[in-house]
């Protein structure tokens, strides 16, 4: 399912399983967008400087762009309200 340029952190597996099928469809589309254009999301600021966030409906995807290695690491896929509580 994942493109060669996208790397998914192991911790995301549980988050993925917690999503409903319609949410997974949104995430799949969002991951394709991120793969096509990693800066499509918004850069985050302290204390998360260096990370990016992309919204897909109520889902927030947090990722890091590894420019020199030419890949993107997906660090979190969660409902936006859950992300705010972390």
Features from the language model and the residues they span:
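Enriched for short, Lys/Arg-rich terminal
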Residues: 1-6, 11-28, 55-59, 64-86
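A short, surface-exposed loop/turn module that caps and links secondary-structure elements
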Residues: 29-55
